[in-house]
């Protein structure tokens, strides 16, 4: 195969750590020269020839030789080096390699390519990993070729290497993690509070109890606070396994700098400006809000000079040199400044807005509560049938023809309304909204119920008032405010449950379990890991700056210190299998099973943009997974007997989602069908579900009047100055009720970042490396998947251009539903499905 003294030519591609800091004075070459000499060594490991211990033979230490400037495929910041390995026939075929970094600075290893291997052609190693000084590791760093093997089919000389690498990633569960560590482990959410700083910043531990169940997050090993041994102390940097912290990516860079800047610099700067009365503390008219995009907001010179030098903030804010900050105009007002106020748009956003996955079919009237009457008394709805305008239908007819729907936040908010209303500047209701499906296929709201806990105590039942649609007089202002209370409930549920809990937090246990138990050689590892990209990192950043005590979420959203605790209450009823789109639609009563339809379900709202478009994406993902899995598993027994796979799923359920481990709905992972279902749901959550609830945040919520995050006062009573204000100045009354100016500026700053695609985003149907596997059949199936997504995008464009679908697809604001278009350019595009929860 190889003659004695044969050499294998290789190319190593890497990124120096300081690539982005390099000056344009030629020092880049000097930095690259540092990799030459005896700075970085590699040793090939045989996949076919074993030593006396049964392990693949290891070749000689070989060092990088020279800079390769002619490689055409290099990306930005990447550098290529030549290397020649001594290798002969007695060593067999290389299947892995060791690498040692003798420098003091780490680098990002992209790949190794071996050329002209006899009978093998090119062998590729896709690495994508930070490599630190070798003394920092307990075992030598190893990388495997891009072949795919279930455990039982691993070449015998590689078996122990495969097992040892997984063991090193699991760690031993002790000690504080360091920056260079690669260890994946679990912990509860016990680091959101900071009781050492103030008892007001203490927060309950989420996870590990029936009171506050929660998914697990990555373990950092930081010690406890002095005040509370159950709370983990804060740190300057929150550890994530090193390869989860994608420091070489623009998306990660933008997110980290942006959110930290907002929480640590911009928020205090805004606060100082308001304290100094240098900018008005309230919006006085709707035009004041529109001025954020048209004229900008004037801030003191020192505030501007504090903010603008920050790299991401420079992009975030537009300044004309006159101490004016401007936000981009949200999509929802780009055609009309007032269409957001219509009942049609209020209803449409429940099926085509940023939170389109909560509305339910109403199957009985009046609506009932599931709250325990022994604790909360009578929580039944006070809405009466004869008060509703059902376009000539009786209540029985409307129910029988499945034309009634409900946005129901009553049971979720009622247990917290009393505590929330005791907070400073927070006043709200638990809401129910009844909607009627008209003959033209659009929804109209017919009643809103606003409920408060009784002043005599919870057992005395709810105090409710029903508000009906009105077009004129003070009643129209009351109706507008009632819709605002609904949207405040919806905004909070969206951010904390639909977005944070159901995508970000629910995904992290699967990320951890995958790296602990599935080798990089495993077919399911190769299938799923693109959908984990940056998830742990953004979640750690959220714990540090967004969902932490007195962080951006608590500062800008109604529930304040109860925000994340409320998501724990919702997690009690989280069901993994219900995250599947068809199951979700059926459970919510907005679809019924129908085998005669392309996707097996029939929508009760015929053009429900999120559901209709989502089912197309769901079906494409399902086909891809159904074609990929049988390439490696021929029978159910193959799934049962895959030791890595079984350990992965057992731990994901029993540790990662341990508070729900005894629920009967978990798939048992005993069949091919189980495996397809599990992978399909994970990919759906990470890609399309997250895209649907994330990238519309600024397009819809950038207009705070359309998506208020808080309410500050209840409906005024007759005879009060506030009631007179409703009569005489409905704009001022509305603005005094919803989110005030300072939290609006902070909120808009955050959601603009969160709604923006980075230039290096990787979208569904794409991979960041075309050589992610050597399996040609898998590559062909993946190409087919990508082509199908392009077809779907064309289909969705046609739907949005269909005159018969304009009511739900464009609505009064004339904003087409594009959130589930698979592709996107960079920027604030209101479209695009990234592979993962990367922002």
UniProtKB/Swiss-Prot annotation:
Q: What is the effect of changing residue 553 to G?
A: Reduces catalytic efficiency 230-fold
Entry's Gene3D superfamilies? 3.10.450.60, Lipoxygenase-1, Domain 2, Lipoxygenase-1, Domain 3, Lipoxygenase-1, Domain 5, PLAT/LH2 domain
Keyword annotations: Cytoplasm, Dioxygenase, Fatty acid biosynthesis, Fatty acid metabolism, Iron, Lipid biosynthesis, Lipid metabolism, Metal-binding, Oxidoreductase, Oxylipin biosynthesis
Question: EC number(s) on record?
Answer: 1.13.11.12
Catalyzed reactions per annotation: (9Z,12Z)-octadecadienoate + O2 = (13S)-hydroperoxy-(9Z,11E)-octadecadienoate; (9Z,12Z,15Z)-octadecatrienoate + O2 = (13S)-hydroperoxy-(9Z,11E,15Z)-octadecatrienoate; (4Z,7Z,10Z,13Z,16Z,19Z)-docosahexaenoate + O2 = (17S)-hydroperoxy-(4Z,7Z,10Z,13Z,15E,19Z)-docosahexaenoate; (4Z,7Z,10Z,13Z,16Z)-docosapentaenoate + O2 = (17S)-hydroperoxy-(4Z,7Z,10Z,13Z,15E)-docosapentaenoate
Domain Lipoxygenase residues, every copy: 148-839
GO BP, sorted A to Z = fatty acid biosynthetic process; fatty acid oxidation; lipid oxidation; oxylipin biosynthetic process
Task: Give me the Gene Ontology terms describing cellular component.
Answer: cytoplasm
What's this chain's function? Plant lipoxygenase may be involved in a number of diverse aspects of plant physiology including growth and development, pest resistance, and senescence or responses to wounding. At pH above 8.5, only (9Z,11E,13S)-13-hydroperoxyoctadeca-9,11-dienoate is produced, but as the pH decreases, the proportion of (9S)-hydroperoxide increases linearly until at pH 6.0 it represents about 25 % of the products.
Q: What is this protein called?
A: Seed linoleate 13S-lipoxygenase-1
Tell me what organism the protein belongs to. Answer: Glycine max (Soybean)
The opening ranks of the lineage are: Eukaryota, Viridiplantae, Streptophyta, Embryophyta, Tracheophyta
């Amino acid at each position: 195969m190889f003659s004695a003294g044969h050499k294998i030519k290789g190319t190593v591609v890497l990124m120096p750590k300081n690539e982005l800091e390099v000056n344009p004075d030629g020092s880049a070459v000097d930095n690259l020269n540092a990799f030459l000499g005896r700075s970085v060594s590699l040793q090939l490991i045989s996949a076919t020839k074993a030593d006396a211990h049964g392990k693949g033979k290891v070749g000689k230490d070989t060092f990088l030789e020279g800079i390769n400037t002619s490689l055409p495929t290099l990306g930005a910041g990447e550098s290529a080096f030549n290397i020649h390995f001594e290798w002969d026939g007695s060593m067999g075929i290389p299947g892995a390699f060791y690498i040692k970094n003798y420098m003091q600075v780490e680098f990002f290893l992209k790949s190794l390519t071996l050329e002209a291997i006899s009978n093998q052609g090119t062998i590729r190693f896709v690495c994508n990993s930070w490599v630190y000084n070798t003394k920092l590791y307990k075992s030598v760093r190893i990388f495997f070729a891009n072949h795919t093997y279930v455990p039982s089919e691993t070449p015998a000389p590689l078996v122990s290497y495969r097992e040892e690498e997984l063991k090193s990633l699991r760690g031993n569960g002790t000690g504080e993690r360091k920056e260079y560590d690669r260890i994946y482990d679990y912990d509860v959410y016990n680091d959101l509070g900071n009781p050492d700083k103030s008892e007001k910043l203490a927060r309950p531990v989420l996870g590990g109890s029936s009171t506050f169940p929660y998914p697990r997050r990555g373990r950092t090993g930081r010690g406890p606070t002095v005040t509370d041994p159950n709370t983990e102390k804060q740190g300057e940097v929150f550890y994530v396994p090193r390869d989860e912290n994608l420091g070489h990516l623009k998306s990660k860079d933008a997110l980290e700098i942006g959110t930290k800047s907002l929480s640590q610099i911009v928020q205090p700067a805004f606060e100082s400006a308001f304290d100094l009365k240098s900018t008005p503390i309230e919006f006085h008219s709707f035009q004041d809000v529109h001025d954020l995009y048209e004229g900008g907001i004037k801030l003191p010179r020192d505030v501007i000079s504090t903010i603008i030098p920050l790299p991401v903030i420079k992009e975030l804010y537009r300044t004309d040199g006159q101490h004016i900050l401007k936000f981009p105009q949200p999509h929802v007002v780009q055609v009309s400044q007032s269409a957001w106020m219509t009942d049609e748009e209020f209803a449409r956003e429940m099926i085509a807005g940023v939170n389109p996955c909560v509305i339910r079919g109403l199957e009985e009237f009046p609506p009932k509560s599931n709250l325990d009457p022994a604790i909360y008394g009578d929580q039944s709805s006070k809405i009466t049938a004869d008060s509703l305008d059902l376009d000539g239908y009786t209540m029985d007819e409307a129910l029988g023809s499945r034309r009634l729907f409900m946005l129901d936040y009553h049971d979720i908010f009622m247990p917290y309304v009393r505590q929330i209303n005791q907070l400073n500047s927070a006043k709200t209701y638990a809401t129910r909204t009844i909607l009627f499906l008209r003959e033209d296929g659009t929804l109209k709201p017919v009643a809103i119920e606003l409920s408060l806990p009784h002043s005599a105590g919870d057992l005395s039942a709810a105090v409710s008032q029903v508000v009906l649609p009105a077009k004129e007089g003070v009643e129209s202002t009351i109706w507008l405010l009632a819709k605002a209370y609904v949207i405040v409930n919806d905004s909070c549920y969206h951010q904390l449950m639909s977005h944070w809990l159901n995508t970000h937090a629910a995904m992290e246990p699967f990320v951890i379990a995958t790296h602990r138990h599935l080798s990089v050689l495993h077919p399911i590892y190769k299938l799923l890991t693109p959908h984990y990209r940056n998830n742990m990192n953004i979640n750690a950043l959220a714990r540090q700056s967004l969902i932490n005590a007195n962080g951006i979420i608590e500062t800008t959203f109604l529930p304040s210190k109860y925000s994340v605790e409320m998501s724990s209450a919702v997690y009690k009823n989280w069901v993994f299998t219900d995250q599947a789109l068809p199951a979700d639609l059926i459970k919510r009563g907005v679809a019924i099973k129908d085998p005669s339809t392309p996707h097996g379900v029939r929508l009760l709202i015929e053009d429900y943009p999120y559901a209709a478009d989502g089912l197309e994406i769901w079906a494409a993902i399902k086909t891809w997974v159904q074609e990929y899995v049988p390439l490696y598993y021929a029978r159910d027994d193959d799934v049962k007997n895959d030791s890595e796979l079984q350990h992965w799923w057992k731990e994901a359920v029993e540790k990662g989602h341990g508070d729900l481990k005894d629920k009967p709905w978990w798939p048992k992972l005993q069949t091919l069908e189980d495996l397809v279902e599990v992978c399909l749901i994970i990919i759906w959550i990470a890609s399309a579900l997250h895209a649907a609830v994330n990238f519309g945040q600024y397009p819809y919520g950038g207009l705070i009047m359309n998506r208020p995050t808080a309410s500050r006062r209840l409906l005024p009573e007759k005879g009060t100055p506030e009631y007179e204000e409703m009569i005489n100045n409905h704009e001022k009354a509305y603005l005094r009720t919803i989110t005030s100016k300072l939290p609006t500026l902070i909120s808009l700053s955050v959601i603009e970042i969160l709604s923006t695609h980075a230039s290096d985003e990787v979208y569904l149907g794409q991979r960041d490396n075309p050589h992610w596997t050597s399996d040609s059949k898998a590559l062909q199936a993946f190409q087919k998947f990508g082509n199908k997504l392009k077809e779907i995008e064309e289909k969705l464009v046609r739907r949005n251009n269909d005159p018969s679908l304009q009511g739900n697809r464009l609505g009064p604001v004339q904003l087409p539903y594009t959130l589930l278009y698979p592709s996107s350019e960079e920027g604030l595009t209101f479209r695009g499905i990234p592979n993962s929860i990367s922002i």
